[in-house]
Amino acid sequence: QSSSLGACAENVQGRDYAQRVRRESNDLLRSSRSSGFDQCAQTGRNERLELTEDMERGPYTFEAPLDDATFERFEPHARTKLRKRYIPHASVNAHMNCRYAISPSTLYSLTGRSGSSSEYVRDVSQPAMDGDFEVPLYGDWVLFAVMSEKSALKYTNKTPSDAAPTKYFSCKLLDLNTQYTNIYHELPGHCVMNMLAFESTRGTSAFDKLWKERDGVLLAILNPRIMRARKGSNELTISPRSADSVLVLGLAEQYGRC
């Protein structure tokens, strides 16, 4: 009987240790994220939270073509051709220091893991850090995508009785990577997702920054919230956290041609 009690105690200790490790990993992951591009990204690394795919953090090294030495007509982080650039490539690359460059296609792959890597398991008793999902990467990640089909101004319906409805707009986000635009007449499903941008009473919001922008602009969005696909749809929806978490890089050349 004493041996069975000892085995039971060891099992309890083992479970307690595993739960403590998960909590520490979750806390570490949360503390590794920035709220805006003006903040310095975490330089640490936790191998237990890295994906099995070969993903590296910036800054990245790109070989510029002879006729475009400063990448005025191409954004290599998104592999997207530009008609007009708003932010110099060197500045974009500086913002990518210790951050992951993520495409819509890659984000679909990450969320398909249900917030887990081979070693990292999300604590379901805690709110998900990235909305309805937790991207199993230590530190910041940046989504690159082209804004499309921006809606008219909308207002939220469900608000407290003493609060005014919140302004917002919806749009599509496209992955105009030349890998896809050179092959497909119509973009495949993993290259398209939705975005919601809401007005905020606490400082300048992504809505304020993007409301007057035209369709076809290439965006870089830092650590956005991710929402599950709506019923009857396979498309994910993301929402930027603030104006500081969004960069408008330029106007995509191939927008409207796919």
Regions found by a protein language model. Give the residues of each.
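Phosphorylation-prone, low-complexity intrinsically disordered regions
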Residues: 1-142, 157-167
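OB-fold (S1/OB) nucleic-acid-binding surfaces
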Residues: 107-117, 155-203
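Short alpha-helix capping/helix-loop boundary micro-motifs
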Residues: 128-130, 201-209
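OB-fold and OB-like beta-barrel modules that bind single-stranded nucleic acids
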Residues: 138-151, 173, 211-228
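A broad, low-specificity signal marking well-ordered, structured residues that form hydrophobic/aromatic
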Residues: 141-143, 169-171, 193-195, 219, ...
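Generic structural motif
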Residues: 150, 176-178, 198-200, 224-226, ...
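OB-fold/S1-family single-stranded nucleic acid-binding modules
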Residues: 222-257
